[in-house]
Amino acid sequence: LEAEALAKAARIVIAGGQVQVQPMGGFGGGWSGGEQLFWHGGAVGAVLDLVVDVPAASKYAVEIYLTRAPDYGKLSFEVDGQPGAMTFNGSSPAVAPSGPFQLGTFALQAGQRKVSLMIVGKDADSTGYFAGIDKLRLYPAGAIE
């Protein structure tokens, strides 16, 4: 699921900051579709929900592709209210795609579900709390027990 397509389809909910679709061609390759969803103007405590359609009740492995840059912050995640396995540090000396980042495996019911990103801080060398979201993938991982 392209994050920028979710924004274009009004499938996001934001509490803190704004989002825009950002072309990434000027930063080299590696972004799916050549764009990302750029989240700016947020601070610690801001939340961005990506609303996704889950086709069937099942366990799903959830993977997200993000961006790193000198002015990006740290994110934590929830999938349908369940905490993700790790936080993501977006700070980097150069703008670059993160590659796949595993949020964990989650039991999800069919229908609209939220993948939530929360700004939780930043490195001392980062100049901001920005975030870039490229895409999200859900892989079936077994029946709900």
Language-model segments: residues:
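Extracytoplasmic
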Residues: 1-145
